[in-house]
Amino acid sequence: MATQIPSLSAPPGYRPQADDTGVETDLLCFYLLRQKTVAERLQMGAQLTRSARQFALNCFHQRFAQLTPRQFARKIAEAWLQEHCPADYVPGGSEVSWIQDSIQLAVELHQIFVAEDIPYYVTGGVAAIAYGESRTTQDLDVVLFVSRAVVPALASALEQAGFYVPGVDDVVSGRMRTLQVTQVDTISRADLIIADDTVYEQQKLARRQAYRLTNETSIYLASPEDLVVNKLRWGQQSQSQKQWRDVLGVLKAQQESLDYEYMHRWAPEFDLAAVLEQATVEAGVREIADRQWATAIYPTIHHAFEIAQARNRTTQPSPNLEIADGNLYTLTRDRAAQTLTVVAKTDDRDIARYDSQGTVLMASPSRQDRQQWREIAARIQ
């Protein structure tokens, strides 16, 4: 039976994932991705990585047919690990093990972290695949919540499991915060990042999400909202188009399931408010984000109107209209239309409208509106 595809349209500002991808094709691809589970999207990414590695092996066999098996193994390690390839490292295993993907590596590391009682979450490219667009990824990024004092014990457990673990002393001393480990038999690499001791890092740990990949194994992923904020931070530092594409992919694939208010609360902490707003426009989810804001702020708006009434600070220019005129915003209740409208006084702009039950009819807040209503909420609580 053929899949029924609904009518798909893009709002103004929508941006496809690539310059050579049409808007209609992009919309269709993400509609289909939204039908997949996290586990299914991870499997799609894993298959892409395995296929890419197998293709690379075939090409290298043709290009370097003169090499001995040991030389060939070293050549593959240098190509795949690049600057992270350890000196004199020659992969063990076989070509079958060399095409292992980062998702399988995450499963194997999960078992070690559980045995060592180390809380963690997977972030980076693997998490972006889980929540967004399928792509290949070179390594696995994992954030660990562990004291530096126990890093030697963790390194020992990793070495016993077949990992090459350099730089332990640098991490223990605080000179570095990342263990760059390589699984010897598979040429698979992971960055194990020691989490900072901050409120936001603890928030991310509390919000991590467990996903079952097999009947017996789960892995922890960063929440999609935290992944978006982190990738915006990384992209801001590196000006990376890959990070931006990952952000758009997560927003397009997750849409209504995301907590945009959470992202908008944290974005200003890292000077990301403008780029987050831009991302919601290019991903076609700005209206969803705006409506979430309007829903979340409605109790504050309703309470502000009640305060104005209690203080006799409303006016009634007609029997059906009651207006609370504040310093920054005007709240107008229309009994005939059964609506409550919020207007920004600086530019006479409607930013939200509700029906009599508080259901959002329209929402179009600016970044300044979001900030000002956060401050209003703090004052009148």
Listing of model-derived features with the role each one plays in the protein:
Residues 2-97:
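N-terminus-biased detector of the onset of the functional/mature region
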Residues 174-179, 208, 316-320, 338-341:
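Short, hydrophobic/aromatic-rich segments at coil-to-beta transitions
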